[in-house]
Each structure stands twice: as C-alpha cells, then as structure tokens.
A protein has these predicted regions:
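Conserved AAA+/SF3 P-loop NTPase catalytic/coupling segment centered on the Walker-B
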Residues: 1-8, 40-48, 61-66
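Conserved catalytic/switch belt of AAA+ P-loop NTPases
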Residues: 1-21
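Conserved RecA-like P-loop NTPase ATPase core
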Residues: 4, 33, 49, 116, ...
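AAA+/SF3 P-loop NTPase mechanochemical coupling elements
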Residues: 15-33, 47
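Conserved AAA+ ATPase "SRH/arginine-finger" region at the nucleotide-binding site
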Residues: 52-62
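Acidic catalytic patch
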Residues: 105-116
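C-terminal engagement/docking regions of AAA+ P-loop ATPases
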Residues: 115-132, 140-187
C-alpha cells in the first residue's frame, strides 16, 4: 500500500527486479473501498485519501425495492439496462468535462483559505491535507455549478467529504461532524 501511495504522491513509479531498476511517470487516482466492520485503517493511510463517502444501507422500503428491481433488471440484460441510462450518463460526463475545463478559472477568496484552516483546527485534523483538500473540493463544486468563485457553502459541502476521516477521535466515536462547530466558524 505504501508503494502505491508514494507513486500517487510523487507521480513516479519505480520497478525493481533482478538488479534492474526502471522509473516511469505514473499519474493516477487511487479509489478504494472498505468495510469499517472489518477493522480500521492507520490514520496516516486515511489522511492520504482525499475524500471519503460514507455509504449507508437504504432504509426506505420503496427505495430498497427499486434497488432490487434495478439489480435484477441489470442481471437479466446488462446492455438494455445500460442503454436506459446512457443519455443521463452522457449528460453527466459532459458536465464533468465542462467543469474540468472551467476549473482553472475558479478563484478562491483568501477569506475561504482562512476559514478552511479554522475549520481544520476546530475539528482537530492533523497536517495540512485536509485544508488543501477542502479548498480543492470547494473549487471543484463551484466549477461543476459553473461559478467563477468558490463560496462558503462550497467549503461547507467540501468539509463533509474531506474531513470526517481526518478528525482525531476516540475509537468509539462515529466520526460525524458536529454541525454547530461548522456554523460557528462560518457565521
């Protein structure tokens, strides 16, 4: 795992075998999944994940039924199932392409840099990856919305993806962000 993280951080990968060493450019995004019930990851490793999305099981019966129906439909005919969503997927892909091109135009006011630092301090995050990740994510949210300037609301939304896995907490705590802290800083 450490080798992957090093390659992701440096943008270079070194392969060594039988006395031969080869280094080449390596640009990739690491995407992982885990089940917290199977154990915890080291904090140093968690800090390397830019964002975390906590996926909970659906509790609404009608939505669960829809999930089951979708899965069965996909298993029966994957091509037909994918065609049903092709237009929606193409629109989303175009929105992402447009945002990627627009991203360099998105500005972050100095006030947001300060707020990001204050939020990270208030939530007890170690290091600076949380601050930087929150700013990058806020810019991305603004780009997706077609705005030229990141806002406090973008920063607040970004914090929910970037900070929970970085917060210092006891093993028995949930990692949920206390909303009153965020509101106090942003007010």
């Amino acid at each position: 795992v450490d080798l992957l993280l090093d390659a992701a951080a440096t943008g270079r990968n070194t392969v060594e075998r039988e006395g031969i060493s080869c280094t080449h450019p390596s640009r990739f995004v690491l995407i992982g999944s885990m089940n917290p019930e199977e154990g915890n990851l080291r904090p140093q490793l968690l800090d390397r994940f830019g964002m975390v999305v906590d996926v909970q099981a659906e509790e609404d019966v009608d939505r669960r039924v829809q999930i089951i129906e979708n899965r069965l439909s996909y298993e029966k005919n994957p091509r037909y199932f994918c065609r049903k969503y092709a237009e929606e997927q193409a629109e989303l892909a175009e929105k992402i392409r447009t945002a990627r091109e627009f991203l360099p135009c998105v500005k972050v006011p100095k006030e947001l840099l300060r707020l990001a630092a204050e939020i990270c301090i208030a939530y007890g995050t170690d290091g600076h990856r949380g601050d930087i990740g929150m700013i990058r994510t806020a810019r991305t949210i603004a780009a997706l919305d077609g705005r030229k300037k990141a806002s406090r609301e973008d920063l607040k939304r970004a914090a929910h993806y970037v900070l929970p896995h970085r917060m210092r907490k006891n093993p028995l705590e949930s990692g949920q962000m206390a909303p009153q802290i965020m509101e106090e800083i942003l007010s």
